[in-house]
Amino acid sequence: MNVKRKRVIVGMSGGVDSSVAALLLKKQGYDVIGIFMKYYNFECPWREDSIDAMLVSQSLKIPFYIIDITKNYKNLIIDYLYKEYKKGYTPNPDIICNSKIKFKFFLEKSIFLKSDFIATGHYVRKKEINENGKISYKIISGIDSNKDQSYFLCKLNKVQIKKSIFPLGWLNKKEVREIANKYNLINANKKDSQGICFIGKIKFLNFLKKKLAEKKGIIIEINKNSHIFKYKQKKLFSKKIEYKKEYGKIIGHHIGAHYFTKGQRKGLKIGGYKYPLFVIEKDITKNILYVGMGKNHPGLYTKVICIKKYNIHWINKKKIKTKIEVECRIRYRQNFKKATLYKKNNDLYVEFEIPQLAVNGGQFIVWYINNEVIGSGLIS
């Protein structure tokens, strides 16, 4: 492959994926530069990871830099998390981090280092389309369905996609580790990172308690046969169910509704029931948790999602006269779910073929056609 020594910045996390991405690009003839981003000091093993990234860069004989973006990360991600949880939402920091932190700062650094491209170890594919001389780019799911990370890149803009290279999109995890072992990379067998790095070994509840104070409130059980479920989302554009105190019975107390998410069962600390209790809704203003018994409780499931026009992001915008058939994900590693997109007053409504479990406001829904990321939206 003749790439005429194009220069590429590779985001090095210290893990095996980004290390193999750098290795493959060097093998292809690119002028590779390794960059490690220090996000936060919150008991996160960033120092060990940075050393691994540095040692891999040394073994590949490529330049290596560490960028300290802790201030930006705090402002854009940490503060965002606290703010959203306080409002009762369940945010996804990884998606925001990719579009507003990682790819943004990689691009800025690429200008400074006169780099042609940026690259990461994400398991996604990028496809260039030439339509009558007009070039555009698509984000396609990685071939390893268990590792596909296209969900996390749903908020990238056109420039970020154009400038990006994803060397691992055509590989599965086993192949990546085999390559790492073949070339004796020190992190060939390093475990994948789990969860959000910045909270380190601290439990997420304790992380939230650092800024969000405990606030005692009541827990109300809603019976699965309650009248409020009889007409649940019968019409596509009908309003969301409004839970009220008088629709159920008080069965306990909690330490703060903002600590819980829909579908959660841990932390309720209420026994004596035949089946587990799950959070089906929360009223942040009144600090009330509504719960239901059993994983088949109708309050846990959602048939229709509304995406407000200001929360819609298109990668490959489709014209929607009335509706369009798509496949969706509302969380990472979820199998594709068949759905229909409807447009009304510039808002989008997503109607699932089968009701979905534990859909939370603040999360992202991503829609696909033939494995291509078409767009995404913040769930209202």
Swiss-Prot record:
- Keyword line: ATP-binding, Cytoplasm, Disulfide bond, Nucleotide-binding, RNA-binding, Transferase, tRNA processing, tRNA-binding
Q: Where is this region: Interaction with tRNA?
A: 147-149, 331-332
Q: What is the E.C. number? A: 2.8.1.13
Mark the transmembrane ranges. Answer: none
Site: Interaction with tRNA. Where?
122, 363
- Disulphide linkage map: 97-197
Q: Where is this region: Interaction with target base in tRNA?
A: 92-94
The GO molecular function terms of this record are:
ATP binding; tRNA binding; tRNA-uridine 2-sulfurtransferase activity
What does the UniProt record say this protein does? Catalyzes the 2-thiolation of uridine at the wobble position (U34) of tRNA, leading to the formation of s(2)U34.
UniProt-recorded name of the protein: tRNA-specific 2-thiouridylase MnmA
Corresponding gene?
Answer: mnmA
